[in-house]
């Protein structure tokens, strides 16, 4: 049987890919296409020695994109495969599975129909995910494909955690409730931290903090998600690069009224113009904001304080939801790489039993590590996420 799995993540104008050899989970090839349907589209790939190569190519739509990825994967010089027959299956990141999907599934016509019914909930992402699936079907009709849903891990939340206190018919008519995102990441790191520490997930209360350009926190009890900070859409919860996170609904209607904004314009303000970028007016990139704060920019300092405070509040809330916490872990671009932000997140959590080893924390960048002191009641860890490997493993298990 064929142990090579291709993982695809199709966005509205991009396709990321990673090719795994599942005999040892090694990455054989990786890269991505950007600016699909726009001028200047290109494929960026990482060669086996770690160097990056950019190939410009006109990619008008997703099928052409997938075709070009297949072409590069089997290229005599650049490719990792002799032929596409070496591929065992393709795994897809699917963003919004609604209430229909609580685990990964083999993509059949029936499944795709059910997934299409969730388009309303993720109008940007889901149609792009479908384009990727259809492109693969068109080019390799017989290859098995698997869908791994960003929302699936959170489907174990109890109703009192996922319902909003809106008129109940809003839930009945439109499925308005908390769904949560980054589920594949939260699932991976919550499992991985238990392996890393050599503990059984049963009886463990874990708070997983996926902090990057988008950010979400989950409460994981006995290996199952019981709450998460993102909601119906990825807009709720933490302050993010360009997203507001939690904001008073009354402020939303007030701004729409004062500025004369249509719903789509208001959505754009909340999703693309808010967060760190909105508060600082400088950048959505934490590295730039941290640098500017060190140089004395007051709005960058404010944004960092707000950002860390929001993370800390959610950690406190989820400790309350689980009657305590055993493990807090950080992952994502900021969580894995920004030691000073991790310190800010943990600052003042002594009451919870968190004691950070500051010297150790300062040495950790993108590695698995324990960053709490040996006598800390709560174990604090950094666990780099690997959503693609999780997708590849799920795909292997289903084909």
Stretches found by the model and what they are:
Residues 11, 92-95, 211-213, 325, ...:
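Glycine-rich beta-strand-to-loop/alpha-helix junction loops that act as flexible
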Residues 268, 275-279, 286-321:
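Adenine-nucleotide phosphate-binding core of ATP-dependent small-molecule kinases
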């Amino acid at each position: 049987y064929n142990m090579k799995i291709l993982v695809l993540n199709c966005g509205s104008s991009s396709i990321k890919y990673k090719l795994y050899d599942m005999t040892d989970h090694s990455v054989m090839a990786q890269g991505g296409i950007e600016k699909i349907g726009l001028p200047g589209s290109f494929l960026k790939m990482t060669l086996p020695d770690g160097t990056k190569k950019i190939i410009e190519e006109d990619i008008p739509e997703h099928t052409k994109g997938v075709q070009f990825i297949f072409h590069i994967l089997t290229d005599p010089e650049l490719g990792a495969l002799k032929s596409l027959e070496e591929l065992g299956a393709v795994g897809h990141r699917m963003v919004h599975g609604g209430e229909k999907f609580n685990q990964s599934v083999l993509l059949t016509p029936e499944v795709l129909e059910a997934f299409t019914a969730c388009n309303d909930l993720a109008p940007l992402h889901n149609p792009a995910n479908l384009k990727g699936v259809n492109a693969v079907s068109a080019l390799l009709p017989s290859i098995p494909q698997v869908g791994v849903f960003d929302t699936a891990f959170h489907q174990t939340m109890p109703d009192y955690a996922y319902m909003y206190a809106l008129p109940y018919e809003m839930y009945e008519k439109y499925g308005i409730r908390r769904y949560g995102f980054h589920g594949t990441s939260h699932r991976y790191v919550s499992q991985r931290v238990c392996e890393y520490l050599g503990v059984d997930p049963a009886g463990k209360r874990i708070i997983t903090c996926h902090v990057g350009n988008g950010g979400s926190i989950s409460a994981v009890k006995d290996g199952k998600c019981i709450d998460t900070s993102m909601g119906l859409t990825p807009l709720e919860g933490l302050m993010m690069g360009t997203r507001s996170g939690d904001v008073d609904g009354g402020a939303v209607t007030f701004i729409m009224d004062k500025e004369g904004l249509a719903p789509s314009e208001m959505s754009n303000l909340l999703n693309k113009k808010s967060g760190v970028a909105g508060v600082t007016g400088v950048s959505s990139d934490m590295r730039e904001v941290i640098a500017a704060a060190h140089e004395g920019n007051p709005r960058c300092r404010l944004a960092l304080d707000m950002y860390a405070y929001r993370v800390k509040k959610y950690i406190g809330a989820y400790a309350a939801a689980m009657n305590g916490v055993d493990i807090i872990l950080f992952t994502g671009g900021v969580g894995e790489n920004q030691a000073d932000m991790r310190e800010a997140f943990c600052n003042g959590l002594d009451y919870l039993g968190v004691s950070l080893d500051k010297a150790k924390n300062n040495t950790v960048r993108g590695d698995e590590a324990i960053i709490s002191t040996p006598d800390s009641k709560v174990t604090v860890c950094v666990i780099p996420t690997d959503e693609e490997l999780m997708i590849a493993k799920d795909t292997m298990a289903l084909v």
